């Protein structure tokens, strides 16, 4: 049984877009409360939609969530409101774009104390591209530091709305929520009623249930989906039976039918979330739609890093933990690898730096695995002299320099929003990181948007931390991938007594190789403990050593018992000691402590 058309006209699908910490999840809580989806007593925790501890702690939403609310409006009609919560961070921008595609409208939340930030703008542009109706909302108006008029003029400049169209709320105190509910119903259009067309549903998220397999969250765009239907996924052509379908209040509510305009879930015995790709289209297996919904793409990892257990006998635990994590995170890619220095581990691919930090933190916190992380790096494209192209995500896979024609690296276009007084500092940081400055736009008299193009490899490190510290926390950034460009890159090896330590190798720009090599050798000299023999730490490009530090040997004073006497006696003892040290050096292996691998991560400190 399909939904009657009037129910489609009383449906509103919307999402909330905001920068980190601008109060998005708190506002979602107030909406749940005002629609009686939850009452205050059930709100044992603030931010109901942020399930993971990490989401609450970092104040970010990592996964997209969906929740259905019912609201009786002033006209006496009951409306169905589907709120699709989107991740706000730059690493998850593809997930955001798919969540937006499942909506007709968006609430643009701007913190009245902070103003418009970089990720607000990035996600706003995605919403405008998706053709959504935007309702600007100013949050935290009750705080003494809020600048309501200043922020309102920024919003007006940004999206060209009238001043009275900007709603003012305090999500924490619950001020202005009623007006917001009226605006959602009045200003966001209802979905198109396309029940008569062949089924097409957009997947915007999936979660793993240990008993039911992957639970797919989808928005029905065209047609009707009934329980028991045979469905086909466009991306991989797999066919399943819809065992259970329904809508999401805070718990799953099974239904017999989902029709055009609805947001709900589908359970069909999918073993792996990787088979339910975000952005894919679901259609009927027997009467399929002729083409999928537009916008699907396979998300590729941008940042790679090696994860190794501190204790080599925890390798299996690490494997199991990664398997469990990847059940819920289709964008995590990992393959086993071995390192001479670190033993067995995994090479993992992440969407970006925040994604990498979250995975590492979850491994340590939820699964109790202690890990060593190698330097994060990006995927380089190496064009060989015989015109073959290979992709290198690990410095140890870099071919010999004689075989390389040239190397290309990924570039990103970046927007940085900051106060105008920090422009000089940010320009300096941009130049240090091989950035290409494009232009600056003024948001208002004191805030600017600066546009740069950067090699991704230069910002995966500590760029965000540096940006925050030179702007006293005022700058925010957002970037998007723009393609590969040719660069003069070299592989820098670290040798201990002539033996390369593969886990310390990195790929750097030739102009920075000497400085990096010198700093690294100095840092390692302070970390590697003294041995019974002399240890040479060298940084080399190919066979050419560009920097060297020496750790002197621990030695016993063999002359302590010689009082006076012949010089040749003393020389004989010294020669004997020297000979022994030489023999030790031939058979001895320098143990590299764990801190040495972390030293690269904070080489400037």
Curated annotation (Swiss-Prot):
Catalyzed reactions: GTP + H2O = GDP + phosphate + H(+)
Main location: membrane
Entry's EC annotation: 3.6.5.n1
UniProtKB keywords: Cell inner membrane, Cell membrane, GTP-binding, Hydrolase, Membrane, Nucleotide-binding, Protein biosynthesis
GO biological process: positive regulation of translation
Residues that, per the record, bind GTP: 21-26, 139-142
Pfam families with a match to the protein in the record: EFG_C, GTP_EFTU, GTP_EFTU_D2, LepA_C
Subcellular location field: Cell inner membrane
Family under the similarity heading: Belongs to the TRAFAC class translation factor GTPase superfamily. Classic translation factor GTPase family. LepA subfamily.
Summary of the function given for this chain in its UniProt record: Required for accurate and efficient protein synthesis under certain stress conditions. May act as a fidelity factor of the translation reaction, by catalyzing a one-codon backward translocation of tRNAs on improperly translocated ribosomes. Back-translocation proceeds from a post-translocation (POST) complex to a pre-translocation (PRE) complex, thus giving elongation factor G a second chance to translocate the tRNAs correctly. Binds to ribosomes in a GTP-dependent manner.
Protein known as: Elongation factor 4
């Amino acid at each position: 049984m399909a939904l009657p058309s009037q129910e489609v006209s009383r449906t509103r699908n919307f999402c909330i877009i905001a920068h980190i910490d601008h109060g998005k999840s708190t506002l979602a809580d107030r909406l749940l409360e005002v629609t009686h989806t939850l009452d205050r007593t059930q709100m044992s925790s603030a931010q109901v939609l942020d399930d993971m501890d990490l989401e609450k702690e970092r104040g970010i939403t990592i996964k997209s969530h969906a929740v259905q609310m019912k609201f009786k409006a002033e006209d006496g009609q009951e409306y169905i409101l589907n709120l699709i919560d989107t991740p706000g961070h730059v690493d998850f921008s593809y997930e955001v774009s798919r969540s937006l595609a499942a909506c007709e409208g968006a609430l643009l939340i701007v913190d009245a104390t902070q103003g418009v930030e970089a990720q607000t703008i990035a996600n706003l542009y995605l919403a405008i591209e998706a053709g959504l109706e935007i309702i600007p909302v100013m949050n935290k108006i009750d705080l003494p530091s809020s600048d309501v008029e200043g922020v309102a003029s920024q919003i007006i400049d940004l999206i060209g709305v009238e001043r009275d169209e900007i709603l003012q709320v305090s999500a924490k105190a619950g001020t202005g929520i009623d007006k917001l509910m009226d605006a959602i119903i009045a200003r966001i259009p209802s979905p198109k009623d396309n029940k008569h067309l062949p089924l097409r549903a957009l997947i915007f998220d999936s979660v793993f249930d240990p008993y039911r397999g992957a639970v797919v969250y989808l928005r029905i765009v065209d047609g009707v989906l009934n329980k028991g239907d045979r469905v086909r996924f466009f991306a991989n052509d797999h066919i399943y039976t819809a065992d259970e379908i329904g809508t999401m209040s805070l718990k799953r509510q099974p239904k017999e039918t989902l029709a055009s305009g609805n947001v709900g879930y589908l359970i069909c015995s999918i073993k792996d979330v990787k088979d339910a790709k975000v952005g894919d289209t679901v259609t009927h297996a027997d009467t399929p739609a002729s083409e999928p919904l537009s916008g699907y793409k396979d998300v590729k990892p941008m940042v790679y890093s090696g994860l190794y257990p501190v204790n080599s006998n925890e390798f299996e635990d690490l494997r199991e933990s990664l398997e469990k994590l990847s059940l819920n995170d289709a964008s995590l890619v990992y393959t086993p690898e071995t390192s001479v220095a670190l033993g067995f581990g995994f090479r993992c691919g992440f969407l970006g730096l925040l994604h990498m930090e979250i995975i590492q933190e979850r491994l340590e916190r939820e699964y109790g695995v202690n890990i060593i992380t190698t330097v994060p790096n990006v995927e380089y494209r190496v064009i060989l002299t015989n015109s073959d192209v290979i992709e290198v995500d690990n410095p140890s896979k870099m071919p010999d320099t004689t075989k390389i024609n040239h190397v290309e690296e990924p570039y990103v276009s970046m927007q940085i929003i900051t106060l105008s007084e920090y422009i000089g500092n940010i320009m300096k940081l941009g130049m240090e990181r091989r950035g290409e400055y494009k232009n600056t736009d003024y948001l208002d008299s004191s805030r600017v948007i600066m546009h740069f193009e950067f090699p991704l490899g230069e910002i995966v490190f500590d760029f965000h931390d540096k940006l925050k510290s030179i702007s006293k926390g005022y700058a925010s950034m957002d970037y998007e991938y723009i393609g590969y460009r040719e660069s003069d890159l070299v592989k820098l090896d670290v040798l201990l007594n002539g033996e390369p330590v593969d886990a310390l190798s990195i790929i750097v720009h030739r102009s920075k190789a000497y400085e990096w090599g010198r700093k690294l050798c100095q840092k390692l000299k302070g970390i590697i403990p003294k041995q019974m023999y002399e240890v040479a730490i060298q940084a080399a490009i190919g066979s050419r050593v560009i920097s060297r530090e020496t750790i002197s040997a621990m030695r016993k004073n063999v002359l302590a018992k010689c009082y006076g006497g012949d010089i040749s006696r003393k020389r004989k003892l010294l020669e004997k000691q020297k000979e022994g040290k030489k023999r030790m050096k031939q058979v001895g292996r320098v143990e590299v402590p764990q801190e040495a691998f972390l030293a690269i991560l904070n080489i400037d400190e």
